[in-house]
Amino acid sequence: MSILSFLLGEKKKSASVAKERLQIILAHERTGHSAPADYLPALQRELVAVISKYVKIGDQDLRVSLERQDNLEVLEVKIEIPQH
């Protein structure tokens, strides 16, 4: 955040807020301090809210899953966007 943004009170874009939250969740998950995938329903709701600002989608149009294979975690987000 720049000094000018701080002084003028410029708000962050919702996409950057969502990105920061996702980075925090993934960093926290990597430390092994949380139960596996207990945050996925909340993450899905927040993603639907952010994406709905730009494209008309519902809860059923977005699916979030977390797969673990050995030391690798894959967070998969599938979004069905209706055609106009």
Curated annotation (Swiss-Prot):
The keyword Cell division applies. Gene3D superfamilies: Cell division topological specificity factor MinE. Disulfide bonds: none annotated. GO terms for biological process: cell division; regulation of division septum assembly. It holds the Pfam family MinE. Keywords: Cell cycle, Cell division. It comes from the Bacteria. InterPro entries: MinE (IPR005527), MinE_sf (IPR036707). The keyword Cell division applies. Belongs to the MinE family. Prevents the cell division inhibition by proteins MinC and MinD at internal division sites while permitting inhibition at polar sites. This ensures cell division at the proper site by restricting the formation of a division septum at the midpoint of the long axis of the cell. This is Cell division topological specificity factor. The gene is minE.
